[in-house]
């Protein structure tokens, strides 16, 4: 007697209906207007201090880009397609060239061998 194992076919399970959550109410922008208002500067603080963080942030951005150094520029075709030594190149328009006419192709002699793609 051989053991047949568990069947891989499963009957589709009945779909359970899930009721959508109840809506609390419409979302209104007026509810959030108090939280969105920017803080007003105090009398003791000059208004120029509020602009300093923006200037400091610009300075940090310049330093970060200078620390990365120049990016090496390489030909994208060389990175995307490694050459194996037997590569057929595309035509000048980037489209493949039509195969040559068989009547015009010369057959190589037995002594000569050509690599074919």
UniProtKB/Swiss-Prot annotation:
Species the sequence originates in: Homo sapiens
Gene assigned in the entry: GAGE4
InterPro entries documented for this protein: GAGE, GAGE_fam
Start-end of Acidic residues biased regions: 32-45, 87-96
This protein's name: G antigen 4
Superkingdom: Eukaryota
Family designation: Belongs to the GAGE family.
Biased composition (Basic and acidic residues): 103-117
Function: Antigen, recognized on melanoma by autologous cytolytic T-lymphocytes.
Tissue: Expressed in a variety of tumor tissues but not in normal tissues, except testis.
Residue span of region Disordered: 1-117
Upper lineage: Eukaryota, Metazoa, Chordata, Craniata, Vertebrata
More details: This gene belongs to a family of genes organized in clustered repeats. They have a high degree of predicted sequence identity, but differ by scattered single nucleotide substitution. Their sequences contain either the antigenic peptide YYWPRPRRY or YRPRPRRY which is recognized by cytotoxic T-cells.
């Amino acid at each position: 007697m051989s053991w047949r194992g568990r069947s891989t076919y499963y009957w589709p399970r009945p779909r359970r209906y899930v009721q959508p959550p109840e809506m609390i109410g419409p979302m209104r922008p007026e509810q959030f207007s108090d939280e969105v208002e920017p803080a007003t500067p105090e009398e003791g603080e000059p208004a120029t201090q509020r602009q300093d963080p923006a200037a400091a942030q610009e300075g940090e951005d310049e330093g970060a880009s200078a620390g990365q150094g120049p990016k090496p520029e390489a030909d994208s075709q060389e990175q995307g397609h490694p050459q194996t030594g037997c590569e057929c190149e595309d035509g000048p328009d980037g489209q493949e060239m039509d195969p040559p006419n068989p009547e015009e192709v010369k057959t190589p002699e037995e002594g000569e061998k050509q690599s074919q793609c």
